[in-house]
Amino acid sequence: MTKRIFLPFLVLFLLPSLVSAQVAITGKITGVVVDSSGASVANATVTVKSPALMSARTISTGGDGAYLFDLLPPGTYEVTITAPGFEAFAETGVVLTAGFTATVNGKLSVGAVTQTVHVEGEPVVDLQTAQTSTTFDQTLLQDIPSGRDPWSTVAQMPGVTSSTFDVAGDNSYQQSAMQVHGSTQAEQIYSYNGLDLNWPGANGGYTQFYTNHDSFDEFQVVADNAPAAVPIGGVYMNMVTKSGSNEWHGQGAVYYLTAGTQAGVKFPTYNGGPVTSGSPFDQTMDASASLGGPIMKDRWWIFGSYRRYDLRQEILSVTDQAGNPVVDVNHQTNTDLRSDFQVNPKNKFSFIWMYNEQNRFFRRDTAYAFVTADASWLQIEPAYILEGLWTSQVTNNLLLDFRVGYNQIRFPLGYQPGVTSTTLNVQDVANSTETGAAPYAFANPAWVLKWTAGGSWYKADWAGTHNFQFGLEWGKSFNGYNYNVNQGIDVLLNGGNAYQVLAYNTPTTQKNYFRDTSFFLQDAWNIKRRLTLNLGVRYDNFRTYYPVQSSNAGETFPDLFPITTYPASGNLVDWNNVSPRLGVAYDPTGSGKSVIRAAFGIYYIMQGTGLAETANPVGLFGKYYSWTDTNDDGIPQESEWLPQGAATNPVSEFGGSSTHINTNMSRPYSEEVGAGYQRQIWNDLSIGVTYYYRTKKNLIGIENSAVQKSDYVPVTGFTNPITNAPLTLYSFQPSDTTLYGKFNYTVTNIGLLDDNSYNGVEFTAVKRLSHKWQVLGGFTIQRQKGVYGRGFSDQATSDNFTDPNLDINRNDNYLNLDSTYVFKVDSTYELPWKIGTSVNFQHYTGYPLQPTETFEVPNGQTPSPVDVGESVILQPAGVQRLPSVNMLNLRLSREFAIYEKWRLIPTVDFFNVTNAQTVIGEVTTFGGSYLFPYSTINPFVARFGLRLAF
């Protein structure tokens, strides 16, 4: 494994001729140089310099006077233009963010070169790209009150909806599922310096790496109309880490709150009485320190950062047997190191190492109300990321960029330190208690290896100017699941009396892999200076599989679970897909202050090892056996629950795979259309309006191919309790009686699910920081409707499309995290005497509810029909909704200059200022607890901070 890890880093230095693809972590500066008559000035010398650059870069204009600088790191730039016989031209204050193209046109006047015309300006409208993205710069990252994690940061972006609502970081220890403008829920990429390094399991849209908020220079989110370099059409988080500079700079910060700075919990009511709900703070402490600077000025920069974050919350709805709420203790540490070395003016190397531990000390099984500390899991979760980056300016117009990254992951749920190998897990189903030890020990080892290489080539005088970008990306990912159970059994009691024994096939190990390869080509073709066509195409190959696997020879009960070897699966899917990415940007006035954009693209929905996991025959199996405690010692001997040895019949069992993959199915994708207008209306303020449309195709679900829908017959006599209307259900009555109990589940494309659409209009206002204030705001009106599939992330793998009972009220549902009106505002403003203020406000229409009920429907078996539980949708999602959510967070700060460049900034943050403890979760299963409120937003809390920067 060591050789596999470090070989790509060796290749990084030995193969500079490779070219390939990745997402922009840099920006561009482009423009046209003309004389006073408007004629192009060829061969003018254009130079850019910035504190973000180790050395200035210089190019010459083409025959049409055009020029382009690509692969510029985020920062503030000065652009200087000189030409013989003309006065020099210089524009300062040009701010670049990741993915932004700044247009700086130079108009030269006849005169001496020694004379310079200075212009101070900051382009805020990107005239050449069609993508929709939001960049959180240092001011937004540091000065907006938030949970200081990726999910509470993305939640500030216009149009985004999330599965959680953050109050001062109360959800920062557990990641959220996000979507934007109808994207697939949890279709999320966590990109570090342009390398996609997600956790590879399930649908591939999650992370195991919890970040250091203060280590980022920028946090860019690409959402819609993305170019061919971006693989998905969901939430693409492009996190750019800080680097050193030619001057030493650093920061130390601490943020603190306790239960004493928090308002009291207001319980929701149900049937006239209060409901215990909420997870208020006990205490949080978030401390970080960072330092960066030069080892050799203009040659070698270094940066380092450390964070320790402790979070303690009371889980009010879960108590011990004495009635005290349990305390959830969480601990996070991060260490981040970066080194940048400028080998020569045209070649730069960077090395990045990030380490994270995300620890939860008492993670409890949610199946029981009372779980003792010794029966909880200990989660000590280490992860690290290694990255190597190389940028080379081959010529003035050709740049190459190579990156390689490795992500090592291990997510464990282990036994507590005091639990020995002979300690048994004891569950009392009547008293809802769990004691002794956790039900099992679990580990999820995983790794991701990615390398990419990309090129940018600029060509003028081809019916306009062209910026070609091209690239190749290759990756291999592994995801495993390991289980072990003390003595191979759990003990089940019923009211303190012997009841059952649950025997497992442990220890067991499951292995899953996927490989992905991509290539893209993109051209930004600028025609007559005002029109830019973005023409892109992307190719993706995805393969997932599991290797040859065997049961563990050390199984506790090999007689119950025979040792078996399973052959390799081969490629369960081998998808080869081509997707167009087409966009247009037009400057209607030629002033550089407004742009009309339109785009169309196909985006293939991301995948992880989920398909391989679904079909993998190796996993956790269990069998329940009746237990008679004949010697009354409370300890199950084998003779008491296996009186006939392996011939003893279990009461029930689980595990084993009866699910298969249709290897010929097509990869799911979405089609996106966007059109909008953006205009700079004052200084650094721009406003815009954009229409978004999206539909998804080739979505997947499960069918039971062992039977047909025609094997079900309609039956009456049922009533819909929501509408009180008669309800027709369907009884399984096949003419072939051997089909009873037959299951052959197949994951395949479900054409019915193609009936879906998203329509939205979004109004935005963005002002970069200048004149002491800044704004990021958006108002979104949207609707996402279609056919509902049981499952998650638009994969209906918990459904059965052969069962007509599950089709009842399946159509015309509001889907996923649909919210009709979403309004967001982030803003900072500096009052006199260096008093800083900031606001973070978010409004969401409540998410849709979907009522269901399980009916017992007798089948046609003779002589005694068997009742089959059928979970039926009583009403399409969205007819009823959760309450709307309004969240207002404020900050006050005061900056003190204490020594030259040293600044001391005390802060106080006020979260959920209105103390709106809104219900955000209700039981949707009809019955005695229908619409029972089980989750609410946490109460108002104040957090105090102190930041020292230089």
Roles of regions detected by a PLM:
Residues G688-P848:
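Gram-negative outer-membrane beta-barrel transporters
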Residues A322-V326, A438, T465-S591, S793-T797, ...:
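Signature of Gram-negative outer-membrane beta-barrel scaffolds
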Residues D684, K697-N698, I702, R783, ...:
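C-terminal beta-signal and adjacent terminal beta-strands/loops
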Residues S163, Q549-S579, G583-G751, D803, ...:
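Solvent-exposed loop/turn elements at secondary-structure boundaries
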Residues H249, S279-R360, L378-V404, P580:
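Transmembrane beta-barrel wall of Gram-negative outer-membrane proteins
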